Amino acid sequence: MAKKITAYIKLQVKAAQANPSPPVGPALGQHGVNIMEFCKAFNARTQGLEAGLPTPVIITVYSDRSFTFETKSTPASVLLKKAAGLTSGSARPNTVKVGTVTRAQLEEIAKTKNADLTAADMDAAVRTIAGSARSMGLNVEGV
């Protein structure tokens, strides 16, 4: 018989830097999950990623207080800010442009995000990422 699911927890945790402090500790503690066990497993799974990049994770908690988790790719906005060398996007993206990204940079981000995108092919994925860039106030070259 399958285990009964009691909760889904969605968090963004820095890759290879999970620790029991907020937001991880309180979110898992209220569901009775072993926090240190999650932190060790998460850090081991995200070891290959660049340390410090926020990584979305969906934790499934079962009735016996066990858990499984699935990591997603880093949000496109974080990757775009990194590619453009910015700390934040534009407060007024349609009037004030704060940086520029090239098609090559967009293709690299699309390859990273491809597993989480619903695009039919790489060109559609690049256009999706380009739309995210424009909504952040970035100029897009070559698309």
Curated annotation (Swiss-Prot):
<dbReference type="GO" id="GO:0006412">
    <property type="term" value="P:translation"/>
</dbReference>
<dbReference type="InterPro" id="IPR020784">
    <property type="entry name" value="Ribosomal_uL11_N"/>
</dbReference>
<dbReference type="Pfam" id="PF03946">
    <property type="entry name" value="Ribosomal_L11_N"/>
</dbReference>
<dbReference type="Pfam" id="PF00298">
    <property type="entry name" value="Ribosomal_L11"/>
</dbReference>
<keyword id="KW-0488">Methylation</keyword>
<dbReference type="GO" id="GO:0022625">
    <property type="term" value="C:cytosolic large ribosomal subunit"/>
</dbReference>
<comment type="subunit">
    <text>Part of the ribosomal stalk of the 50S ribosomal subunit. Interacts with L10 and the large rRNA to form the base of the stalk. L10 forms an elongated spine to which L12 dimers bind in a sequential fashion forming a multimeric L10(L12)X complex.</text>
</comment>
<dbReference type="InterPro" id="IPR036769">
    <property type="entry name" value="Ribosomal_uL11_C_sf"/>
</dbReference>
<comment type="function">
    <text>Forms part of the ribosomal stalk which helps the ribosome interact with GTP-bound translation factors.</text>
</comment>
<keyword id="KW-0689">Ribosomal protein</keyword>
<dbReference type="InterPro" id="IPR020783">
    <property type="entry name" value="Ribosomal_uL11_C"/>
</dbReference>
<keyword id="KW-0687">Ribonucleoprotein</keyword>
<keyword id="KW-0699">rRNA-binding</keyword>
<keyword id="KW-0694">RNA-binding</keyword>
<dbReference type="InterPro" id="IPR000911">
    <property type="entry name" value="Ribosomal_uL11"/>
</dbReference>
<dbReference type="GO" id="GO:0003735">
    <property type="term" value="F:structural constituent of ribosome"/>
</dbReference>
<dbReference type="InterPro" id="IPR020785">
    <property type="entry name" value="Ribosomal_uL11_CS"/>
</dbReference>
<dbReference type="InterPro" id="IPR036796">
    <property type="entry name" value="Ribosomal_uL11_N_sf"/>
</dbReference>
<dbReference type="GO" id="GO:0070180">
    <property type="term" value="F:large ribosomal subunit rRNA binding"/>
</dbReference>
<comment type="similarity">
    <text>Belongs to the universal ribosomal protein uL11 family.</text>
</comment>
<dbReference type="InterPro" id="IPR006519">
    <property type="entry name" value="Ribosomal_uL11_bac-typ"/>
</dbReference>
<protein>
    <recommendedName>
        <fullName>Large ribosomal subunit protein uL11</fullName>
    </recommendedName>
</protein>
